[in-house]
């Protein structure tokens, strides 16, 4: 009985969880962004030549973005894991 109750509590707590990521495009950055329930990944996409990460794009995604040949991408599944790499 105790296991059933713990399972129900865990399912209830997890059901409303949404991931939090850093969100940034070329001009505007928001350090704290709540993703939709469908967006289960954080990502950071940057040019390989941009060593400082000044033009990095960060955000939430349902699937990991496919980088262009001159880009790098990092996808992760924990809150605010999409820092500069």
Swiss-Prot record:
| Record-annotated membrane-spanning stretches | none
Give tissue specificity per the record.
Expressed by the venom gland.
Mostly located where?
Answer: secreted
Q: Which CDD domains match?
A: TFP_snake_toxin
Instruction: Note one Pfam family from the annotation.
Output: Toxin_cobra-type
Q: Which UniProt keywords apply?
A: Disulfide bond, Secreted, Signal, Toxin
Q: Name one GO molecular function term.
A: toxin activity
Signal peptide (UniProt feature, chain positions): 1-18
S-S bridge residues: 21-42, 24-29, 35-60, 64-75, 76-81
Recorded hits in InterPro entries, A to Z, give: Snake_3FTx (IPR003571), Snake_toxin-like_sf (IPR045860), Snake_toxin_con_site (IPR018354), Toxin_cobra-type (IPR054131)
Q: Which Gene3D superfamilies match?
A: CD59 (2.10.60.10)
Q: Which domain of life is it from?
A: Eukaryota
Signal found in the keyword field: yes
Q: Where in the cell is it found?
A: Secreted
Recorded GO cellular component terms are: extracellular region
In the record, the note on similarity to other proteins reads:
Belongs to the three-finger toxin family. Ancestral subfamily.
* Listed name of the protein: Probable weak neurotoxin 3FTx-Lio1
């Amino acid at each position: 009985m105790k296991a059933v109750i713990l399972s129900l509590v865990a399912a209830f707590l997890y059901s409303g969880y949404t991931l939090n990521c850093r969100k940034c495009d070329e001009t505007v950055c928001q350090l704290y962004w709540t993703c939709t329930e469908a967006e289960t990944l954080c990502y950071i996409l940057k040019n390989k030549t941009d060593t400082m990460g000044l033009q990095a794009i960060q955000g939430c995604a349902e699937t990991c973005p496919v980088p262009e040949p001159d880009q790098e991408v990092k996808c992760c599944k924990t809150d605010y894991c999409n820092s500069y790499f």
